[in-house]
Amino acid sequence: HFIKAEGEENVQPEFPFLCLLVSGGNSQIILVKAYNDMEILGQTIDDAAGEAIDKCSKVMGLGYPGGPIIDRLARQGNPKAFTFSKPHIPGLDYSFSGLKTSFLYSLRDWIKDDPDFIEHHKTDLAASLEATVVDILMDKLRKAAKQYKIKDVAVAGGVSANNGLRNSFREHAEKYGWNIFIPKF
C-alpha cells in the first residue's frame, strides 16, 4: 500500500524509492525499484519498533496498544530527559530488543528509589523512548538513502502514524532534500 501513498504535494514517489515499513511486526527498509521489484535492504533481527514500544508501554502500565499512548504522552515530554541504549548493528538491519531491555532495567532501578517514578515522569519517559526509536529508525534510513543515492522516501505501517517519526521525516526532507511520502491519517 505504500506505493500508492501520496506525499505532501499529492505526487507519488518515482522509482526507485525507499520505503520504511514500520509496525508492531515489521521494521524494514525496502528499495522499491518497480511495482513488482522490491528488495529488503534492512530489517529487524529481533523485535520490531512497534513491538518494542508496545512492550515498554505495557511495562509502564499504560496499556496496549502502546503506540498511540506513547505518542500522545511524548508530545508533552522532554525527549532528552532520559537516555536509552541504541544498538550498534552493522549494515542496515534493526534491533530493538536491547532498547526494550535497557528501558526495563532503567525503570526497575528508578522505581527502587521512587515507587511513583513512572507516574512522576511518564511524559518524559514516553518522549525519550519515542526519540530513541525514531533515531534508530532514521539513522539506518539515512544511511540507505545515501548509499543508494535515493531522494524519494516513503513510510508505511502502523508506526507511521507516530508524530515524532512524521516530524523526523519532515526534518530529514528539509535537511537532505528528500521528497517524502507520508500516509494521511
Where are these regions (language model features)?
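Conserved phosphate-binding catalytic cores of ATP/NTP-utilizing and phosphoryl-transfer enzymes
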Residues: 1-17
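Glycine-rich phosphate-binding/hydrolytic loop that grips phosphoryl groups
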Residues: 1-2, 183-185
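A cross-family phosphate/adenosyl-ligand binding-site feature
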Residues: 12, 19, 64, 81
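Short beta-strand scaffold segments in enzyme catalytic cores
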Residues: 19, 27-31
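Glycine-rich phosphate-binding loop plus the immediately following alpha-helix
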Residues: 23, 32-78, 100-101, 105-110
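Glycine-rich beta-strand-to-loop/alpha-helix junction loops that act as flexible
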Residues: 23-25, 153-162
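Active-site catalytic microenvironments in core metabolic enzymes, especially phosphate/sugar-handling
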Residues: 24, 181-184
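A contiguous, well-structured pocket-lining segment that forms one wall/lid of small-molecule binding clefts
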Residues: 72-153, 163-180
